[in-house]
């Protein structure tokens, strides 16, 4: 259904100051900041629970130049953060948006802490592709560590209404071309069995809502939209697995493009290299493979028994290397670490994978090699070589940064191993915004009045590929900024 102009006599079912489409990081942050100004907020979530992908992601969050870094003696800068992101994004990122994140990230962290989010104290994660440790580790081990306290805080506010099973259908455009409201369906039920839920699902009752200050797009990406993602990249076949929740489709994005929102880099899709082929979707093993094996341990090709990449490189580099090894015969690489590494990470990262059986535990490296059918002799020599690199601090094979291993290698039994493979994780492209989170028109090249966006539905922040933990700060920060923009209208 195309966007339409309501007749002068048209009556809305309801009127709010702000309508937010989506209930993840960007949506929650926007709602909180706008509600603080006394604005009346309506948040629409099409699924039966709030949070979207934000609730199931890893949850750790990058923040350059933060107080913990300074206390730990870690030197960082806005310029270094932007350079790291641009390197992994192949130089097609929008520097002004990255600069905005760097300038406001400490405000964002303060906001979520004030809302009850808890981080591991006095600790910074050293994520792949980053030059220095700059990421806070969320205590909960997943994005639920934000969504639960933020949702609880919003539920206590009388001027915030959150509706689940509420499917956005379209924008209502005023006579001046501004977005002045939306149509949505109440009582909608998502149906994962349909080829395209956005096109085929007609459940629910249509309602119209006036948005006096504007509409915020916080609907996330389209990693589960089989048709749209393959349209952008024909190599991504329908059976390609994704880490995302089933509702991650392009419905809201395509409606925004339909009213003139400028598209940015829609064909760039990111794979997450930390996934397990035996699990559906995100699974429970990602944090273990990432923080135990790739941050501190090693990954080997089972046929050769040898390493084949810098395990601390950016996600695109690692995913490309993994796909090359996997080939056509499902030769899934094996990620390995030891007991000392396991004891150094968040206990929740290993508990569930062990219980689910995706991570295997062995008394000796020989047993690990036998179980995973790794070239044993070559593997044992490769472990010795890797341990030597850790000792000297120099990776002569792949130039991995080892100084933050702080002596942790693969030498203390028991040993742990897990298969790994990439899955579609993040759709890099989306609508164009400016640093004020205003959506830009591809017709006028100016902001579309009344339309804002933040999070994965936005393109350009990360370029061709994003660094881990930057999506969280991106969504929270631009959600916060959009909320501030709405709040300023209340004055």
Outline where the language-model segments fall.
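Conserved N-terminal/central alpha/beta ligand/cofactor-binding core
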Residues: 2-10, 40, 46-170, 178, ...
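N-terminal Rossmann-like FAD-binding beta1-loop-alpha1 element of flavoenzymes
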Residues: 18-43
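Residue-level detector of alpha-helix initiation sites
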Residues: 24-25, 48-49, 383
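A glycine-rich dinucleotide-binding beta-alpha-beta segment and adjacent secondary-structure elements
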Residues: 378-465
């Amino acid at each position: 259904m195309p966007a339409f102009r309501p007749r002068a006599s048209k009556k809305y079912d309801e009127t709010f100051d702000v309508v937010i489409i989506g209930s993840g990081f960007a949506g929650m942050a926007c709602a909180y900041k706008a509600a603080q100004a006394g604005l009346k907020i309506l948040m629409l979530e099409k699924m039966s629970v709030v949070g979207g992908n934000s609730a199931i992601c890893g949850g750790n969050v990058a923040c350059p130049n933060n107080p913990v870094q300074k206390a730990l003696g870690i030197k960082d800068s806005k310029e270094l953060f932007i350079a790291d992101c641009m390197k992994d994004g192949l130089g097609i990122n929008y520097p002004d948006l990255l600069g905005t994140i760097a300038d406001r990230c400490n405000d964002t962290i303060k906001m979520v802490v004030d809302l009850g989010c808890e981080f591991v104290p006095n600790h910074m994660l050293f994520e792949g592709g980053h030059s220095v440790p700059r990421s806070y580790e969320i205590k909960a081990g997943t994005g639920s560590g934000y969504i639960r306290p933020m949702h609880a805080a919003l539920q206590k506010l009388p001027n915030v209404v959150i509706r689940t099973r509420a499917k956005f259908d379209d924008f209502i455009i005023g006579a001046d071309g501004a977005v002045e409201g939306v149509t949505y369906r109440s009582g909608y039920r998502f149906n994962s069995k349909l080829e395209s839920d956005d096109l085929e699902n007609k459940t629910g009752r249509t309602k119209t809502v006036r948005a006096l200050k504007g509409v915020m797009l916080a609907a996330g990406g389209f990693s589960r939209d089989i048709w749209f993602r393959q349209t952008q990249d024909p190599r991504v076949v329908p059976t390609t697995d994704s880490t995302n929740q089933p509702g991650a489709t392009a419905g809201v994005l395509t409606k925004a493009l339909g009213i003139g929102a400028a598209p940015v880099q829609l064909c760039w899709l990111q794979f997450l290299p930390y996934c397990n082929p035996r699990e559906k979707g995100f699974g429970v093993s990602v944090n273990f493979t990432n923080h135990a094996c790739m941050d501190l341990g090693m990954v080997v090709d089972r046929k050769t028994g040898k390493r084949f990449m810098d395990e601390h490189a950016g996600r695109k580099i690692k995913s490309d290397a993994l796909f090359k090894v996997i080939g056509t015969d499902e030769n899934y690489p094996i990620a390995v670490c030891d007991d000392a590494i396991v004891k150094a990470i968040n206990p929740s990262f290993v508990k569930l994978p062990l219980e689910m059986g995706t991570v295997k535990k062995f008394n000796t490296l020989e047993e690990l090699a036998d179980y995973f059918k790794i070239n044993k002799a070559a593997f044992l020599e490769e472990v010795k070589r890797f341990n030597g690199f850790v000792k000297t601090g120099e990776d002569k094979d792949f130039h991995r940064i080892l100084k933050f291993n702080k002596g942790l290698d693969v030498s203390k039994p028991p040993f742990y191993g897990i298969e790994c493979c990439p899955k579609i994780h993040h759709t890099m492209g989306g609508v164009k915004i400016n640093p004020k989170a205003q959506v830009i028109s591809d017709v006028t090249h100016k902001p579309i009045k009344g339309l804002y966006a933040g999070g994965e539905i936005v393109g350009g922040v990360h370029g061709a590929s994003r660094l881990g933990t930057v999506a969280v700060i991106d969504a929270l920060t631009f959600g916060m900024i959009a909320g501030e923009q709405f709040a300023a209208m209340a004055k």
